[in-house]
């Protein structure tokens, strides 16, 4: 038997960063995101040799171990080993050898939630193999727990919940790891129009999000008013985006994104940089009414809202920066698992 899973990556549309502690614990966070047709994929193939083989196909990395209850977290394939260690501890694989292969449709550090989505996909493959009765909230919290507590990776909570639930969601974040996911019933024509007008542009640079997120968290802990006020405004931006999508006020989306872009830069150093500022201004001059940096910032993907047929001019003008626009569709489903 072969056990497979795939979980969708996400575009953050508004409220990004307010899902990160301690802000979400102190003030409550709100984010609006949508999953897209780029995926993190995982496959588990059992073997009879008591060998554990990890393979990240897209990164050309491979490790092989004799069976062990706990594998070293040493900087190579840590997400794969971290999930294995936790699954083995909680559910006992009873010495079953296997090959775990993964592939992600976007680079790590690109701002689409790749790392957390990959963790969800790996957990999904194990739950398929072990027939574990985990629901969407259970799965997302389990992934969050592995990343933050077992692997000590800094970050928020939205990616894990987007990957498990899928679709367009308004998410609320509170103290004690409380998360509420509100699926939005956006009319199909409005979703098609959003998809048509939203350019997903890869800057051809990646970044380590943890450093930016740690600065952001420290700014809240140190009670830096400028940073905290920016997060308050981003939370309001998520509410405005929710209303615009539900009521079909798509002409407001560019302005909401533009406002959020200006606020997000206030949250921590390193979120934007001269290259991203130049890309942003070029897109606006070409007809985009607003945009944002996807994820924590510092590199990776940017999105631009381009009404009318402005997206063609925007994509053409951005070619000079050496990145590329990525085709996608919005998808309604979250994590999927199956056996063959």
Residue ranges and their predicted role:
Residues 112-136:
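DPxDG-like acidic metal-binding loop motif
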Residues 299:
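Glycine-rich active-site/cofactor-binding loop and its immediate structural neighborhood
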Residues 84, 94-104:
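Flexible, acidic active-site loops/lids enriched in D/E/S/T/G that coordinate Mg2+ and/or position polar
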Residues 109-112, 265-267:
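A generic structural signal for short coil/turn motifs at secondary-structure boundaries
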Residues 106-110, 289:
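Short pre-catalytic strand/loop immediately N-terminal to key active-site residues, enriched for Gly-Thr
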Residues 99, 135-138:
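Extended low-polarity, hydrophobic cluster-rich segments
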Residues 1-12, 19-20, 25, 31-33, ...:
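C-terminal nucleotide
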